[in-house]
Regions:
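Sec-dependent bacterial lipoprotein signal peptides
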Residues: 1-19
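Function-determining sites in protein domains
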Residues: 20-129
Length: 129
C-alpha cells in the first residue's frame, strides 16, 4: 500500500512539474502582411513581400514561450499580422525580455534571446528613423 501511495505521489509531482513548464508557441495562419511598430516615435512600417512576411512569422512562431507575470510596462516593438483583407490576425508585443500575446505575458524558452529578434527588426528599412 505504501508503495502505491509513493508511486501516486511521484506521478502527481511529475504532472505538476510538466504543467509548470508547459511551452506555448504563437500561431499565425495565412498572413498577407505585417505591420511593425517601434515605440517612442510612432514609427510604423508595413511589410508585404511574401518572403519577408514568412521569414519574420517563422522566427516568431518558433520561439518557445512560458506563461509568466509581466515584468515590463514599456514595449519596444509591436508586430501585427494582417490577412489579405487587411484584418488583424494577431498582435505580439516585445517588452523587455518578454513577449505579450493575446493578453498574456510570456518568458522566452531556455536558450532563446529576444535581442536576436530585435536585432533583425532594427535592420528593417524605414522602421528606425
Amino acid at each position: 500500500m505504501k508503495k502505491i501511495i509513493a508511486l501516486m505521489l511521484v506521478l502527481t509531482l511529475v504532472a505538476a512539474l510538466a504543467a509548470c513548464t508547459q511551452v506555448t508557441r504563437i500561431s499565425v495562419e495565412n498572413p498577407a502582411e505585417i505591420k511593425l511598430e517601434k515605440a517612442g516615435g510612432g514609427v510604423a512600417v508595413t511589410l508585404t513581400e511574401n518572403k519577408t512576411v514568412s521569414r519574420i512569422t517563422d522566427v516568431i512562431c518558433q520561439i518557445p514561450l512560458q506563461a509568466a507575470e509581466a515584468t515590463e510596462d514599456a514595449w519596444t516593438y509591436r508586430i501585427t499580422w494582417l490577412d489579405a483583407d487587411g484584418k488583424t490576425i494577431t498582435t505580439v508585443t516585445l517588452a523587455g525580455s518578454q513577449i505579450r500575446w493575446e493578453g498574456q505575458s510570456y518568458n522566452l524558452g531556455v536558450g532563446v534571446d529576444l535581442s536576436v529578434v530585435t536585432d533583425v527588426l532594427e535592420t528593417i528599412p524605414g522602421l528606425n528613423k
